[in-house]
């Protein structure tokens, strides 16, 4: 299995790691959000703890950065040979799902928070757990490529190949 795409440009690399760091950060500070959201639903002036506010604003930043990332991705798109290899097709599908979830997860959260829709909070939670599962799969695949296949895939996202 060969990785056909050339190296990523600086904007793609910076956006990748910035968004990844923000997602991981928000995931780990989200414990308080359930309580804050319930308080917020009861009284829209309540639930604004420092952590909840940071979580909401980081989520909004993620939406903006994902939009920029998609634009940069399409502007930087290189011609790729469509692979018939099962793992390469699966990787493509997982990448597309990650892009979709990187956008939708904070949109679901913002919809729940700003419009007071409890159901969207539940959707947000399910979607983030799904996305984090795909992120782990993505990370393991990158490590597999780097250390088992030794094809330099991981180095590309560090701008080294």
PLM ranges: what are they?
Residues 1-161:
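Membrane-embedded alpha-helical bundles that constitute the cytochrome b-like, heme-associated redox core
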